[in-house]
């Protein structure tokens, strides 16, 4: 999976896709730092799933 910058609604959409029915813990400070300011990949996103 290619790392990419995900910000705002794109980041939320990606979390819905990755986490599905499990849902996710949205901690803007942590995930924006990791995935918006820097590129992140699908494995990084999975860390935020419930």
Swiss-Prot record:
Q: Where in the cell is it found?
A: Secreted
InterPro entries, per this entry?
Answer: Insulin, Insulin-like, Insulin-like_sf, Insulin_CS, Insulin_family
Q: Which Pfam families match?
A: Insulin
Top-level lineage group: Eukaryota
The entry lists its GO molecular-function terms as: hormone activity
- Provide the disulphide bond pattern: 7-36, 19-49, 35-40
Task: Please give a single GO biological process term from the UniProt record.
Answer: glucose metabolic process
Keywords assigned: Carbohydrate metabolism, Disulfide bond, Glucose metabolism, Hormone, Secreted
Report the principal subcellular site.
secreted
A GO cellular component annotation in the UniProt record: extracellular space
Whom does it interact with, and what assembly results?
Heterodimer of a B chain and an A chain linked by two disulfide bonds.
- Annotated function: Insulin decreases blood glucose concentration. It increases cell permeability to monosaccharides, amino acids and fatty acids. It accelerates glycolysis, the pentose phosphate cycle, and glycogen synthesis in liver.
Q: Which family does it belong to?
A: Belongs to the insulin family.
Q: Which PANTHER family match?
A: INSULIN, INSULIN/INSULIN GROWTH FACTOR
Q: Specify the protein name.
A: Insulin
Which species expresses this protein natively?
Oncorhynchus kisutch
């Amino acid at each position: 999976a290619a790392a990419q910058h995900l910000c705002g609604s794109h980041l939320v959409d990606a979390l819905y896709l990755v986490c599905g029915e499990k849902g996710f813990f949205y901690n803007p400070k942590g995930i924006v730092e990791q995935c918006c300011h820097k590129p992140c990949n699908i494995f990084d996103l999975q860390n935020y799933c419930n």
